[in-house]
Amino acid sequence: MKLAIVAGDGIGPEVVAQAVKVLDVVQPGVEKTNYDLGARRFHATGEILPDSVIAELREHDAILLGAIGDPSVPSGVLERGLLLRLRFELDHHINLRPGRLYPGVKSPLALEPGNPEIDFVVVREGTEGPYTGNGGAIRVGTANEVATEVSVNTAFGVRRVVRDAFERAMRRRKHLTLVHKNNVLTFAGSLWWRTVQEIGEEYPDVELAYQHVDAATIHMVTDPGRFDVIVTDNLFGDIITDLAAAVCGGIGLAASGNIDATRTNPSMFEPVHGSAPDIAGQGIADPTAAIMSVSLLLAHLGLDDAASRVDRAVEGYLATRGNERLATAAVGERIAAAL
């Protein structure tokens, strides 16, 4: 395996170091290349993501990312110039966000004993919607300012994400929920609903449901156990996945995959928490989400046994840690030792 590592900013290098520690135990011999991308490079050279680096990244099997963002860089510069550009250049059309409440982890929800287990996955479209940069503004700063952000939804883009979601549902509990707002967003909503129904005919064993996005947020709080696989567009997915993380114990336990399902380009795996510059360098950041991202990476590459071993080690750690607060390195060492 050839792995590109982008540790990034803030706590990124700290949590990635522990993720790599676990990877080395479960999958020895990985060929790793570190890439200096983020605020430090931006300040030193003015570069964000050179074309030459993108070309090099394409030669790898996967990318492991830490975190991007620093208060010394204007908001949006690194996010659009690095994160979003990687997603578009490498065609990461699927953003995969598992949501599971692990034994030993407390949810902010007042869950009743006997409630269904919280274990779902969100398949979010990653390269379309309102994040394509299709918009503009005129008369900026005046009382007559007009601003637009156009949501782009293509049949090709929707179909490939929906099909991936059905495939995942077949490997899970065979239930898929489309989340959208087709009573108001009638054009895009119609495309999504018709596509789900059409492709759903190829998967008769998968039970299909639909929820407006506002209803989905309610049910994710009141009855999250009803969900198995959720498929949704870029914007709605961006919102409900963070709610899902909170329901499952916090964003510090949320892993993600930015995936090119065609495998033409390397997919990228990362914890979804930010760079947390306020605690960077203190050795107190929780690397669990970064380690869980390694599990997603291994599973994507077909190394299912190694991925399962990481999952079990993380589950065992979370089940026994209680209220103990461990240093970053100690968490990595404990999970690695469990392997």
UniProtKB/Swiss-Prot annotation:
Localisation: Cytoplasm
Record carries keyword Amino-acid biosynthesis: yes
Alphabetical list of PROSITE patterns matching this protein: IDH_IMDH
Chain residues that bind NAD(+): 274-286
InterPro entries the record matches: ICDH/IPMDH, IsoCit/isopropylmalate_DH_CS, IsoPropMal-DH-like_dom, LeuB_actb
Cofactor dependence: Mg(2+); Mn(2+)
Pathway: Amino-acid biosynthesis; L-leucine biosynthesis; L-leucine from 3-methyl-2-oxobutanoate: step 3/4
Record: residues binding Mg(2+): 214, 238, 242
EC number: 1.1.1.85
Binding positions for substrate per the UniProt entry: 87, 97, 124, 214
GO biological process: L-leucine biosynthetic process
Pfam families noted in UniProt: Iso_dh
Site (Important for catalysis): 131, 181
Keywords on record: Amino-acid biosynthesis, Branched-chain amino acid biosynthesis, Cytoplasm, Leucine biosynthesis, Magnesium, Manganese, Metal-binding, NAD, Oxidoreductase
Gene Ontology MF terms in the entry: 3-isopropylmalate dehydrogenase activity; magnesium ion binding; NAD binding
First-level EC class: oxidoreductase
Record's cofactor remark: Binds 1 Mg(2+) or Mn(2+) ion per subunit.
Catalysed transformations (reactions): (2R,3S)-3-isopropylmalate + NAD(+) = 4-methyl-2-oxopentanoate + CO2 + NADH
Protein family according to the UniProt entry: Belongs to the isocitrate and isopropylmalate dehydrogenases family. LeuB type 2 subfamily.
NCBIfam families associated with the record: PRK03437.1
Subunit structure: Homodimer.
Protein name per Swiss-Prot or TrEMBL: 3-isopropylmalate dehydrogenase
Upper lineage: Bacteria, Bacillati, Actinomycetota, Actinomycetes, Mycobacteriales
